[in-house]
C-alpha cells in the first residue's frame, strides 16, 4: 500500500487536551478517584508497594481550578487541533469503512465484559452504549486504547517488581473522561505514566474557523459542531542511565457536520530517547516499528521515521530529542477501517519494541558520571517539551490550565550545567553525533 504526505501536520490538539503526551487529569468534583491498582489477572498479596500519594491521589481542594483545566483542555483541542502543517495519508483513499455483515457483532455481551475485566478500569463509555454500537469506530478505538493501556501497565509493573500503578479515573463535565495510570519512584522506573482519554462535546466557533482555514468545509447546526476525541499516550523515564526513555501516543478524532457528514482522522507515534547509544537497542526498536508499518505498506515506515526525526528537533541545540521512531498525523486514508488497523498494529508494537530493552539494561551497573550525563540529557527532554511542543506551550499560556497535568511528561529530575561539553570520542559524544545526524537503523 502506497503512502502520500501532503500539507497539514503535528498533533498539538491531543496534548492540549491531555496535558502533553496524554497526562491530563481533567477535573470535575467527580474525578478525584485515584486508587492503587492491582493489575488485571492477579490476585492475592503482591510484592509491589502501592503509591497512593502525590497530586494524582489527592481530591478535595482545587476543584475549581481543575474544572477550569478541563475547559482549558477543550479550548486547547479547539485552538490547536486544526493548526497542522503536515498530513499523513495512505492511498488510494476509499469512500469510507467497510459495511459490516448483516447481524454481525464484534463482541457479544459476555465477550465484551470479559475484555473489559482485563482493563485498568472500566471503560469511559458505558457498556450498554458500547454494546449498542459494536461496529462504530468510537467503540473499536476506545476498546483498543483501553487494552493498550492495560498491556503496557502490566508489562511495566512486571519489570519494576516493586511499585504499583496508581489509577486515577476522571470525568469531564462536558462529556467523557479518562483514566490516568502513574507509577512513580519504583525500582526500575523513575516515572511512568500511561493515560487514556475519551472526550466529546461541541467545538467552539474558533475551532471550526481554524478547521475551515485548513481546507475543510464544515456545516454547523445552531453554530455547533459535535466532536469526539480519544487516545492512549505514555511517557516512561527509567532510573538506570542505560535504559532509555520512551514515549508513544495513538489517537482518533472526528467532527460531525449538521448534515451528518463526519470528518475523521488518526494520529500518533512512538519514539525512543536513550542517554547512551546502544546500536543493538536502536536497531531492535526501529526494526520492530518497521515490521509493524510494513504490514500496511512498504513506504510507510521511512516517511513516518523522517517525520519523527523532523518533529522532535531541538532547534536551539541543533539536535533531536532522541533517536526517533515513527510519527504521523491526520491519517484519513485509504479507509477508516484500514487506518484503524494500522494504528492498532502500531499500538501492539509498543511493548515488544521497548520492554526487552528495559529488561536488558535496568540492572546495568553505572557510575556517577553516567548518572550526571543522564540528568543533562533529561534537561534536553525538558527543553523540547517546554519550548517546542505545541500542546505544552498552549497549555502553559492558557489561564486556568492544570499545570500538574501539563508537566507530568517531564522527568522527576534533570540538570543543566554551564557550557557543558563531553570529551571528544567519548560515549557521551557518540550519542550526540546520532542526535545531530539521524541514522537509518534498519538497512
From Swiss-Prot:
Pathway: Porphyrin-containing compound metabolism; protoporphyrin-IX biosynthesis; protoporphyrinogen-IX from coproporphyrinogen-III (O2 route): step 1/1
Basic and acidic residues compositional bias, start-end: 103-112
Annotated localization: Mitochondrion intermembrane space
UniProt-recorded Gene Ontology molecular function terms: coproporphyrinogen oxidase activity; P-type sodium:potassium-exchanging transporter activity; protein homodimerization activity; structural constituent of eye lens
UniProt-annotated stretches for the region Important for dimerization: 182-191, 381-417
One protein family per Pfam: Coprogen_oxidas
Catalytic activity: coproporphyrinogen III + O2 + 2 H(+) = protoporphyrinogen IX + 2 CO2 + 2 H2O
Residue ranges, annotated region (Disordered): 89-112
Main location per the UniProt record: mitochondrion
Gene3D superfamilies: Coproporphyrinogen III oxidase, aerobic
Keywords attached to this entry: Acetylation, Heme biosynthesis, Mitochondrion, Oxidoreductase, Phosphoprotein, Porphyrin biosynthesis, Transit peptide
Chain positions found as Phosphoserine: 101
Residues bearing the modification N6-acetyllysine: 393
Gene Ontology biological-process annotations: heme A biosynthetic process; heme B biosynthetic process; heme biosynthetic process; heme O biosynthetic process; potassium ion transport; protoporphyrinogen IX biosynthetic process; response to arsenic-containing substance; response to insecticide
Active site: 247
Family from the record: Belongs to the aerobic coproporphyrinogen-III oxidase family.
Primary role: Involved in the heme biosynthesis. Catalyzes the aerobic oxidative decarboxylation of propionate groups of rings A and B of coproporphyrinogen-III to yield the vinyl groups in protoporphyrinogen-IX.
PANTHER family linked to this entry: COPROPORPHYRINOGEN III OXIDASE, MITOCHONDRIAL, OXYGEN-DEPENDENT COPROPORPHYRINOGEN-III OXIDASE, MITOCHONDRIAL
Subunit (UniProt): Homodimer.
Protein name according to UniProt: Oxygen-dependent coproporphyrinogen-III oxidase, mitochondrial
Amino acid at each position: 500500500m502506497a503512502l502520500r504526505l501532503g500539507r497539514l501536520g503535528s498533533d498539538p490538539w491531543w496534548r492540549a487536551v491531555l496535558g502533553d503526551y496524554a497526562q491530563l487529569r481533567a477535573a470535575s468534583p467527580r474525578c478525584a478517584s485515584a486508587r492503587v491498582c492491582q493489575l488485571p489477572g492477579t490476585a492475592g498479596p503482591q510484592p509491589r508497594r502501592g503509591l497512593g500519594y502525590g497530586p494524582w491521589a489527592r481530591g478535595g481542594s482545587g476543584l475549581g481550578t481543575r474544572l477550569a483545566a478541563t475547559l482549558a483542555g477543550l479550548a486547547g483541542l479547539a485552538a490547536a487541533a486544526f493548526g497542522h502543517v503536515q498530513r499523513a495519508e495512505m492511498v488510494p483513499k476509499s469512500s469510507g469503512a467497510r459495511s459490516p455483515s448483516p447481524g454481525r457483532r464484534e463482541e457479544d455481551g459476555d465477550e465484551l465484559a470479559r475484555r473489559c475485566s482485563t482493563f485498568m478500569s472500566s471503560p469511559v463509555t458505558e457498556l450498554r452504549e458500547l454494546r449498542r454500537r459494536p461496529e462504530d469506530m468510537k467503540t473499536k478505538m476506545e476498546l483498543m486504547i483501553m487494552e493498550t493501556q492495560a498491556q503496557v501497565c502490566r508489562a511495566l509493573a512486571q519489570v519494576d517488581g516493586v511499585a504499583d500503578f496508581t489509577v486515577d479515573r476522571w470525568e469531564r463535565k462536558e462529556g467523557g473522561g479518562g483514566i490516568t495510570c502513574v507509577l512513580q519512584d519504583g525500582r526500575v522506573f523513575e516515572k511512568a505514566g500511561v493515560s487514556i482519554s475519551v472526550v466529546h462535546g461541541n467545538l467552539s466557533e474558533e475551532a471550526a474557523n481554524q478547521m475551515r482555514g485548513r481546507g475543510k468545509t464544515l456545516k454547523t447546526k445552531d453554530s455547533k459542531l459535535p466532536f469526539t476525541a480519544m487516545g492512549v499516550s505514555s511517557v516512561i523515564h527509567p532510573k538506570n542511565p542505560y535504559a532509555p526513555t520512551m514515549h508513544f501516543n495513538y489517537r482518533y478524532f472526528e467532527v460531525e457536520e449538521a448534515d451528518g457528514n463526519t470528518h475523521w482522522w488518526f494520529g500518533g507515534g512512538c519514539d525512543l530517547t536513550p542517554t547512551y547509544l546502544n546500536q543493538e537497542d536502536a536497531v531492535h526498536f526501529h526494526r520492530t516499528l518497521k515490521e509493524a508499518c510494513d504490514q500496511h505498506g512498504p513506504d510507510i515506515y521511512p516517511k513516518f521515521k523522517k517525520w519523527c526525526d523532523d518533529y522532535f528537533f531541538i532547534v536551539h541545540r541543533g539536535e533531536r530529542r532522541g533517536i526517533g521512531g515513527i510519527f504521523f498525523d491526520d491519517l484519513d486514508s485509504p479507509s477508516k477501517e484500514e487506518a484503524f488497523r494500522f494504528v492498532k498494529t502500531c499500538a501492539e508494537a509498543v511493548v515488544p519494541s521497548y520492554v526487552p530493552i528495559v529488561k536488558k539494561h535496568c540492572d546495568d551497573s553505572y557510575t556517577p558520571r553516567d548518572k550526571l550525563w543522564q540528568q543533562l540529557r533529561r534537561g534536553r527532554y525538558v527543553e523540547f517539551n517546554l519550548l517546542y511542543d505545541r500542546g505544552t506551550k498552549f497549555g502553559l499560556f492558557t489561564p486556568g490550565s492544570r499545570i500538574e497535568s501539563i508537566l507530568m511528561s517531564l522527568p522527576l529530575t534533570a540538570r543543566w550545567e554551564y557550557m557543558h561539553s563531553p570529551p571528544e570520542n567519548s560515549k557521551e559524544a557518540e550519542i550526540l553525533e546520532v542526535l545531530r545526524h539521524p541514522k537509518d537503523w534498519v538497512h
